[in-house]
């Protein structure tokens, strides 16, 4: 093979490899607009998973003036976690522990445009669209969150991905519905009846 043919083959192979590596990090596949909730009393560890964004984005945990999770309208209270270009993939931040069922609201600040986008309901965002996918149990006991940083999309959620331990998307404190309780009660009554029938008569 001539050197020019060899060089051409190498360049062609490199070009084919580019699309495969453009998203060489996890992107949450489900959970558009879901909330991130505390699932246990253990510390919540955030891990930076990667991005393919051209814009520079900062990730914050929203806190109120007392340092508790929440949105009091003052972003200077928020805890900086990662920057999608400055943080190393795999880096971690311990966010501490919180009461089970507490919503952790995350804010993505887009440095290039000044927009802020949030986890949870679409109504929190300036364009009225959900800007985060939240995938519970992406890994065992770990939730994956992926953000979109552009106003009005394209909603490929590849602009900053991060994961958290000890978090869920359904409230662990949620009381079962009355129908579920009734079904459970009938099951217990049925088991008690079967047990009585099996007991020998005296």
Regions found by a protein language model. Name each.
Residues 176-194:
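A short, hydrophobic C-terminal helix/tail in secreted or cell-surface proteins
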Residues 25-146, 150, 167-170:
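Extracellular distal adhesion/interaction modules in secreted or cell-surface proteins
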Residues 1-8:
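Bacterial N-terminal signal peptides that target proteins for export
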Residues 10-17:
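Bacterial N-terminal signal peptides
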């Amino acid at each position: 093979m001539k050197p020019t043919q060899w060089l051409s083959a190498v360049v062609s192979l490199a070009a084919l490899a580019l699309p495969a590596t453009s998203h060489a990090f996890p992107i949450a596949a489900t959970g558009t607009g879901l909330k991130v909730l505390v699932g246990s009393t253990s510390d919540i560890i955030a891990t930076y998973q990667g991005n393919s964004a051209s814009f520079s984005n900062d990730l914050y945990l929203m806190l109120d003036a007392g340092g508790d999770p929440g949105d009091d309208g003052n972003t200077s209270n928020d805890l900086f976690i990662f920057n999608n270009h400055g943080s190393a993939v795999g880096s971690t931040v311990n966010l501490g522990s919180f009461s089970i069922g507490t919503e952790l609201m995350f804010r993505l600040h887009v440095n290039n445009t000044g927009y802020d986008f949030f986890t949870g309901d679409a109504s929190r965002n300036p364009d009225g669209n959900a800007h985060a996918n939240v995938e519970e149990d992406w890994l065992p006991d770990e939730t994956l969150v992926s953000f979109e940083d552009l106003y009005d999309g394209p909603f490929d959620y590849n602009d900053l991905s991060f994961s958290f331990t000890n978090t869920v998307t359904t409230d662990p404190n949620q009381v079962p519905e009355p129908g579920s309780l009734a079904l459970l009660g009938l099951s217990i009554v049925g088991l008690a009846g079967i047990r009585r029938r099996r007991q020998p008569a005296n």
